[in-house]
Every structure is written in structure tokens, then in C-alpha cells.
């Protein structure tokens, strides 16, 4: 059995997440589970019924808190992948936790850790040795400066520049 991916609770963001997953070329099938999406293979309350046919699932909610909550529920049955667009750059020493979604042309630098269910937007840069918490949404063009910490559930505006030192002066 190959890898099959469910995109759960996707609302508007699901189409983009599907394109990111397709760019990776590692899923033989990608489907949606959502109460409001035309073409979804099922409703949210039925998500468990697709296991073991589908072995991977990821939440694609716009809201980081909701995304994190859904991924926590899903991990009881499914593998929660890290999705990264083929046009993103991720350092080999970076650590991306389950449920991360990295959009095109984003960069994750050396020694950085990206928390669970965090979205790194297109053209965003997480520089060296940063810690980005769980459930964050770094919108397009966000820059997280070297050795910064981004608190859990942070949501930025496009083009934001963040610096909160990991070390005390």
C-alpha cells in the first residue's frame, strides 16, 4: 500500500496544501475530508473511517490553534507528515515537527526548529537557530531573524520582521 494523504478541515487553504503535497511527488492519492467542501470524500465526523486505506492526514485550517487541535486528534491513527513545496529550501539541520507546511520559496535555516502544525508562508525566511512554536502561521514574506523565538500560536501579517532573542543578555 502506498502513501495516501487526507487533507482535513481545509476550508480555503486546502487547495494550496494539496498543490504543495503534489509537488513532493510522494503521495499516490490526495483527498479532502471536510463538511463544507464540494468533492470531499467524507465529513469531519467520519475522518477515522478512512484509516487504514489512508495512512497520512494533515489539518489545513487557516487558524493555527484549530490546525494544531486537529493534528493532535489525527495522530491517534494517522501519520502526520511535514509538507514542503519542492521550491522551498530547508537546511538539513533544521527540525520540522509533524504537521508543518512550508510554502514555495520559503527558507528554513540551519539549526532552526519549527513547531507542530506551523505554516511557513511563501517567500518567508526563518534564519539560523530559530525556534518557532506550535500552531504558528507565518504569512508570506515574514522574516524571523537569527536566534529568535516565536511564541506558540503566533500569526503574522505579510512582510513582518520578527526578532525575540532566544538568549538572555
What role is predicted for each listed range?
Residues 1-86:
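Terminal amphipathic alpha-helical/low-complexity segments used for targeting or macromolecular assembly
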Residues 82-169:
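Structural signal for interior beta-strand "rungs" in well-ordered beta-sheet cores
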